Amino acid sequence: MKIGLFIGALATKMNLHDQIKMIIDAEKRGFDSFWFAQTGETDVLTTIALAGKETENIELATGVIPTYTRHPHVLAQQAATVNAAISNRLILGIGPSHRPGVERLGLKYDRPALYIREYVEILRELTTQGHTNYQGDIFNIESSFNLIDSTPMPIMISALAPMMLKVAGEVADGTITWMAGLTALRRHVIPKLNAASASAQRGQLRVVAGVPFSVTDDIRNTKIVAGEKFQVYGRLENYRRILDYGEVEGPSDVAMLGNEVQLAEQIAQYFDAGVTDLILAPFASDIQDESNLSNLDTLQGIAAEYNV
C-alpha cells in the first residue's frame, strides 16, 4: 500500500525547473512515487531523467505516455536509457489515449486493445532482452539495441474497459486508472484484472488508482470547484464509461474531499478495496487559487502511515 503524487491531469502552469523542484520536495516529504501524465507540456521521460539526477529513492512514473505517436522500438530505447539514468526507478505507464486526439494527428485509432497487447509484448522483449523479432496482427518488427545499465522495468497500461483490463492482467504489470472511484474499482476494475491475471497464471498485479484530492472544510463548494476543473473527463468516452461503471454523475463525485480525518478514512477504503498504489492529484479548493501546499502538508502526514 503506497501513496504517491500525480500531476498532469490539469495544466500544471509550472516550468520545467519548478516541476523538478516539486519532485525533489515529494521525495523529501516521503512520498513513494511521482507520476506524470504526458500532456501538451514537457516531455515526461525527459523530465524524469532530469529529476532522477536530483533524487535517490522515489519511483518516477509515466501515467501515461500515448502510444500511437511512438513506435515501440523508439519508446523502449528511450525508456531503457532513462531507466538507467535514474538507477532503475522508472515505471513505464502507457496507453492508447483517446480517439479524438489520435485522429486529430492524422492517425488511425484502430483495435486499441489488440494494439496495446502487441505493443506491451514488444516493449517487454526489448527492455528485457534488447532485441525482438515480433510477428503479430498489427506489428511486424525485427529490431535490437544494447541494454546498458538498465534492468527490466514495470510496464503498466491505462486499462479501464473490459478488454483492456484483460490485456493488463495477461501481459502487463497492472493497470493505472483515472476517474475510477471506489465502486468502479471494487465491482469492475479489480475483479476483471485479477480474473485475467489468474487465467494467465500470473501473480497479483499493481492497481494504481489516480484520484483528485483536496483538503477542505467546505466539501460542497470544493466539489463545485472539482466539477469545473475536471469537467473534460466527463466528456471523454473512456472516462465517461468508467464514471458510469462507478454509478456517479461526474468527475466531482470521484474527487477525494474533506479534512485530514475524513481523507484518511477515504484513503483506507481504497486500500481495503484492493488498490496497491494510490496516486493523488492535489487541487486547490478555490478555483482562483493554485496553491497546493496545505494539500501536501496534510497528505504527507497520512502517507507516512503507509510509505514505510
Describe each model-derived feature in a short phrase.
Residues 1-308:
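Active-site-adjacent structural elements that line small-molecule/cofactor binding pockets in enzymes
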